[in-house]
Amino acid sequence: MSIHKRIPALLLGVILLFAGIPAGSISAQAADTTQQLNNIVLFAQFPDADTDNFMADKTDTAIAICNDTSTPRSLTSYIDAISYGKLHVTSYFPQLSDGVIQPYVLQNSKAEYTNYEQYAIEMVQNIRIPDSIPLDGNQDGMTDNITLVI
């Protein structure tokens, strides 16, 4: 899948995930406060991929699509706009190393997985998230959001 298809798919997936946030969790905040949500973005690729790292030349684009506040097309700007400034999303990339996202290599080829839950569970279980990355931005005791990019 090309970058032009992969990045919008990532953004749509994140938007759909945040669409599932109960409205009451936002409205319960005081009228003049902004709720913080943290989005943990995890990357994986199949072992039989055409390249060793599909993110090698796409890291800056992926980060910008999530966090760039200078454009209304980023996830952060979009969520800020549709929530009228009541919800702020910051995306974190635990696999970022020396300026490049290093995707986790899944254990099986794409054909060996029967559904996406199998590799989603594998990713969450095997990708290390450093303690320095805040999982709970709204302090409700739960991880706010995880986005998986394959």
Features from the language model and the residues they span:
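Propeptide-to-catalytic entry region of secreted or membrane-anchored zinc metalloproteases
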Residues: 29-150
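N-terminal prosegments of processed precursors
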Residues: 6, 14, 28-33
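Bacterial N-terminal signal peptides that target proteins for export
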Residues: 1-11
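Gram-negative bacterial Sec-dependent N-terminal signal peptides
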Residues: 10-18
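Intrinsically disordered, low-complexity segments enriched in Ser/Pro/Gly/Ala and basic residues
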Residues: 1, 24-26, 108
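C-terminal segment of classical bacterial N-terminal signal peptides
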Residues: 17-27
